[in-house]
Curated annotation (Swiss-Prot):
This is Transcription activator of gluconeogenesis ERT1-2. Residues 63-159, 231-263, 329-349 are annotated as: Disordered. Transmembrane segments: none annotated. Residues 23-51 bind DNA.
Length: 559
């Protein structure tokens, strides 16, 4: 139904009706159009053949598609990539296909997906490559020339992430800090540990995260390489010779760098007067491991027969037996050159490692018995970095590359988050965290003494903090051996249980605080025998939401 014609009072002529949509010519000249096609103005002007509806501008809030074209009149400069605006869904899809980190899952895929087929530069160390990223080493001209950019393009600082350029400064700072720890008696890490790191061009927004993934990558790819500075510096400290330098037989023995991993382990064990039965957790020396399972009555009976034995009556092998080869900082014992285990008063103290290599990890912590002691004596934060590096050293000495890849995958899910959560904390916050840990440990020790259940308490790095006497009766380990030498929980587990440990911990570190259950957890005794158990973990967090301690209960499976 058409509207009635309205007569204008000023002109006395019918008013021109507003058109629903102007034609293209009237739209350009901003003139009033009508609904006829061709309109009256186009007929008068001779544009009747081209009079069509004009195109309206779509409102921005109604536009579903972003304008991906650059502005009119602007052209990008040569060599500058113009990135179009993308929706969140498109951006996520493109980042996933290109291999760039977008979420935690993509970061995992980026670093773990290419591990089985790494790129090997001239220096012999495979690097964890990332699609679309240039790999650059800061280790000198020789390594920088290992990979050349394609197409004749030169690598300029503008093509690298901003935080990647300060990696070398970060490494120097951390080395200096670790050197200060050694001067204060807390530890002495060799700078060679960091000299062989393969720093890949990761583009995370955190320097600490980039550093962490470089350490994890190097942990996997330097495993089993005799010339790896990382493994040599952590296993042998700052010394380039065998620890048993006073033995005349060392002149005829091959150096550890020239031997295979298995031969190197046996050589160092024999040079320290240890017997074959002391190797209780090594897949590389599987002939030393007893595959039989002990029952709880046998272990209890064995412990009862040795309850009243004094330390002076123990044999030399029992005194020297380390918990494991790779992390036994070792009680300083004297042996003569023939390695028979007898004491030599004139020779200096020796251990499997150099005296200061992992001292920060295995220094005996004070035993607090009262809350006042906790709040009064704890004035410095607890350093988790030496413990983490000690754990990596142990894993590299025990497991093969395929197992290390699986463990690194799980570590990559929680380790960078630990660093990110603690970066914003002040020193007073870290001191308070340690006070909370020790205060909570006091209460748990009371509860463990009353519960009667085999129980262990360890930190998020895996270092044992408390052990119940029931666990000692179950496993055969003494409390002095487990707590006095700052043992890792993974040392008490067999290979499959260690892999399951890292998988469960990555799931509960920032997930369900109620803990997890390991239906089949196999413990290792001092003699290398295995005990099947079922364990339950309870995770306790600090006031900042970080995992503080894990309480594990172990019950034997007798069937």
């Amino acid at each position: 139904m058409e509207k009635p014609v309205v007569i204008s009072q000023r002109t006395g002529k019918p008013k021109r009706r507003k058109a629903h949509r102007a034609c293209i010519h009237c739209q350009r000249t901003h003139l009033t159009c009508d609904n006829n096609r061709p309109c009256e103005r186009c007929v008068a002007r001779g544009f009747a053949d081209t009079c069509v509806d004009g195109v309206r501008k779509k409102l921005k809030y109604l536009d579903d598609k972003e304008d991906n074209k650059p502005s009119k009149g602007l052209s990008p400069a040569p060599g500058v990539n113009v990135q179009p605006k993308l929706s969140p869904a498109t951006r996520s899809a493109r980042s996933s296909s290109a291999g760039f980190p977008d979420t935690k899952g993509n970061m995992q895929q980026q670093h773990m997906g290419n591990m089985p087929v790494p790129n090997t530069p001239q220096n012999g160390h495979p690097n964890l490559g990332t699609p679309g990223m240039a790999h650059t080493n800061l280790q000198g001209p020789q390594r920088q020339g290992a990979q050349q950019p394609q197409g004749g393009q030169s690598s300029t600082p503008s093509q690298l992430p901003a935080d990647y350029l300060i990696h070398q400064q970060l490494l120097a700072t951390e080395i200096n800090q670790l050197g200060d720890l050694g001067r204060t008696g807390e530890g002495d890490f060799s700078s060679d540990w960091f000299s062989d790191l393969q720093l890949s061009g990761h583009s995370f927004q955190s320097v600490a995260t980039n550093m962490e993934y470089s350490i994890l990558s190097n942990m996997v790819y330097s495993s089993g390489q005799p010339n790896s500075a990382v493994s040599n510096s952590l296993l042998l400290g700052n010394n380039s010779q065998s620890p048993n330098t006073h033995s005349p037989h060392n002149q005829d023995q091959p150096t550890p760098q020239a031997a295979t991993p298995s031969a190197k382990i046996k050589q160092l064990i024999e040079s320290n007067g240890l017997s074959a039965k002391d190797l209780n957790q090594y897949p590389l020396a599987g002939e030393f491991v007893n595959d039989t399972f002990l029952t709880v009555p046998e272990i209890v009976a064995f412990n009862e027969t040795r309850r009243n034995v004094k330390d002076s009556e123990l044999t030399t092998d029992e005194k020297l037996r380390p918990l494991s080869f790779a992390v036994a900082a070792g009680q300083p014992q004297n042996t003569n050159g023939n390695g028979n285990g007898s004491e030599a008063p004139d020779s200096p103290s020796k251990s499997i490692f150099s005296s200061g290599a992992l001292e920060a990890v295995y220094s005996n912590l004070p035993d607090y018995t009262d809350p006042i002691q906790v709040y009064t004596n704890i004035t410095k934060p607890f350093s988790y970095t030496p413990g983490y590096h000690g754990l990596i050293s142990y894993l590299k000495g025990r497991f093969n590359k395929q197992q290390l890849v699986q463990m690194t995958k799980y570590m990559a899910e929680y380790r960078p988050s630990f660093i990110a959560c603690t970066n914003s904390l002040k020193e007073e916050d870290l001191v308070f965290m340690e006070q909370c840990f020790q205060r909570a440990l006091l209460e748990y020790q009371k509860f463990i003494s009353f519960s009667g259940t085999p129980t262990l308490v360890w930190r998020r790095t895996g270092q044992l903090a408390a052990v119940g006497k029931e666990f000692c009766q179950l496993s055969g380990w003494s409390e002095q051996r487990l707590i006095g030498q700052q043992t890792f929980i993974v040392e008490l587990l067999d290979d499959n249980s260690v892999l399951e440990y890292f998988e469960l911990f990555s799931r509960i570190a920032f997930g369900d605080s109620r803990g997890a259950t390991m239906a089949d957890c196999t413990l290792l005794t001092p003699t290398g025998a295995k005990i099947k158990t079922s364990s339950i973990w309870t995770l306790k967090r600090d006031v900042f939401g970080n995992p503080m301690m894990i309480v594990g209960n172990f019950l034997p499976i007798l069937s």
